[in-house]
Amino acid sequence: MSRYRGPRLRIIRRLRNLPGLTNKLVESKKNQASGNDQSNQKKVSQYCIRLEAKQRLRFNYGLTERQLLNYVRIARCAKGSTGQILLQLLEMRLDNILFRLGVVPTIPSARQLINHRHILVNNRIVDIPSFHCKPKDIITIGAPKTYQSIITKRIEAFAKDQIPDHLTLSLSEQKKPKGFVNYLINRESIGLKINELLVVEYYSRKA
């Protein structure tokens, strides 16, 4: 299954707000239907609940089905809670790190910066959005000056308290942004509201 490139509002109406996909907020179809007669509403199966959780995770981080399945398999082989390790793997992706730093408004826009070879990790160009960042990694932006100014304005308007504790963002005297990974993210700092155990249960027979 390929990465979704269709209308984003259609997705968030169905799956609720996904900050990584779009910063637009809409009322979900479930909330719109809350005023309807309860007798007309079908009981949602456990499978559908797990499927929705999986879809929320996949669309928020911009993954293909195969990519997400691979992450689940890696998480299963690691020591610790499979669900928390899965979220940690996704949150430590380079495209998501740029998004959480406030450098870009969404993960797709972060992926565009990376694909255009504008991002450096430890002074080396990285053009792989799924690149796994580690503690003590330093992330800088080598975009053209016109793009740098746009990024700088966004960072200056971005509330610093929105940056999670495992990351630090600073601006040099030349107004160039620099991100620093302090440590691996913990569960409390995950940006997406989701029950990761439902995702693990969904893949229990596939991974």
Curated annotation (Swiss-Prot):
Q: Which SMART domains match?
A: Ribosomal_S4, S4
This protein's name:
Small ribosomal subunit protein uS4c
Protein location = Plastid, Chloroplast
Q: What does this protein do?
A: One of the primary rRNA binding proteins, it binds directly to 16S rRNA where it nucleates assembly of the body of the 30S subunit.
What is known about its subunit structure? Part of the 30S ribosomal subunit. Contacts protein S5. The interaction surface between S4 and S5 is involved in control of translational fidelity.
- Record-linked SUPFAM superfamilies: Alpha-L RNA-binding motif
In the UniProt record, the gene name given for this protein reads rps4
**Residues of the S4 RNA-binding domain:** 92-156
Entry's family note: Belongs to the universal ribosomal protein uS4 family.
Q: What is the organism lineage in this UniProt record?
A: Eukaryota, Viridiplantae, Streptophyta, Embryophyta, Tracheophyta
InterPro entries associated with the record: Ribosomal_uS4, Ribosomal_uS4_bac-type, Ribosomal_uS4_CS, Ribosomal_uS4_N, S4_RNA-bd, S4_RNA-bd_sf
Listed under GO biological process in this entry are: ribosomal small subunit biogenesis; translation
Q: Which Pfam families match?
A: Ribosomal_S4, S4
UniProt organism field: Equisetum fluviatile (Water horsetail)
Name the keywords, alphabetized. Chloroplast, Plastid, Ribonucleoprotein, Ribosomal protein, RNA-binding, rRNA-binding
Q: Which residues form a coiled coil?
A: none
Presence of keyword Amino-acid biosynthesis: no
**Main location group:** plastid
A single GO cellular-component term from the record reads: chloroplast
